[in-house]
């Protein structure tokens, strides 16, 4: 069991925010994020939010053609994945002219920026004067629908969306600071936003992350 404090989360997301700015990624640039249930998912999502970069979470079930569709549909400038999807991204890169930056979490690979390397090189504080200003109505997240009857559709969420989930935490989940909250969803589904991310963080609850392979009835 590895424990991370709220202070750890803030500092780690600050490092990634600084890394984004150092790379030249700007406010309004879409970033494809396909990560499992690991702490780095939080660092990336919050770092994007702090810099105005538009995170596009994707489920870990996505294949190369699905990644290509999402990158091209949103004109994504950045892809942040693990080795599980690195080869698929490389396979479709030539078809994605807007894709300029590749970030690999948990490993090193030729042609990729290692997440750990770019973050450790940055400060764990952000200079508020250099951070882009974001407004409540500006785009913060893009989710894609499941595409049951046609191609997946983009669904945008603005910066006010996060604060709106205080209602989710208070009146639906009844979250308290003393609670330990566990949501099993994949990080690419919208449920992750209101199960893994905003309500428990707003409430100050502890969040349990477990990234086992598949669903084990005895364990879960």
Model-derived segments and their meaning:
Residues 35-46, 61-65, 185-202:
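Conserved coil-to-alpha-helix start sites within the AMP-binding
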Residues 22-23, 46, 50-120:
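Structural core segment of the AMP-binding/adenylate-forming
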Residues 1-46, 63-68, 116, 120, ...:
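Conserved AMP-binding/adenylate-forming core of the ANL superfamily
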Residues 104, 110, 122-144, 151, ...:
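Conserved pre-ATP/AMP-binding loop-to-beta segment of ANL
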Residues 1-23, 27, 51, 86-87, ...:
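N-lobe entry segment of adenylate-forming
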Residues 31, 48, 79, 139, ...:
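Conserved S/T- and glycine-rich ATP-binding loop of Class I adenylate-forming
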């Amino acid at each position: 069991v590895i424990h991370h404090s709220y202070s750890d989360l803030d500092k780690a997301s600050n490092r990634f925010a600084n890394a984004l700015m150092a790379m030249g990624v700007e406010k309004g640039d879409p970033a494809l994020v396909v990560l499992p249930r690991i702490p780095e998912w939080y660092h990336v999502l919050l770092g994007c939010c702090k810099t105005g970069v538009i995170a596009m979470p994707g489920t870990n079930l996505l294949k190369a053609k699905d990644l290509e569709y999402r990158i091209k549909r949103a004109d994504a400038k950045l892809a942040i994945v693990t080795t599980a999807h690195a080869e698929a991204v490389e396979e479709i890169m030539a078809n994605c002219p807007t894709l300029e930056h590749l970030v690999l979490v948990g490993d090193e690979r030729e042609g990729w920026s290692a997440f750990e390397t770019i973050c450790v090189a940055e400060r764990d504080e952000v200079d508020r004067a250099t951070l882009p200003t974001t407004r409540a109505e500006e785009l913060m997240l893009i989710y894609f629908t499941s595409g049951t009857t046609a191609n997946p559709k983009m669904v945008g969420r603005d910066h006010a969306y996060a604060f709106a989930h205080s209602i989710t935490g208070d009146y639906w989940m009844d979250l308290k600071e003393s609670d330990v909250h566990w949501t099993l969803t994949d990080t690419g589904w919208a449920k992750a936003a209101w199960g893994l991310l905003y309500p428990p963080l707003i409430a100050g609850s502890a969040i349990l992350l477990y990234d086992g392979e598949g669903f084990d009835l005895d364990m879960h």
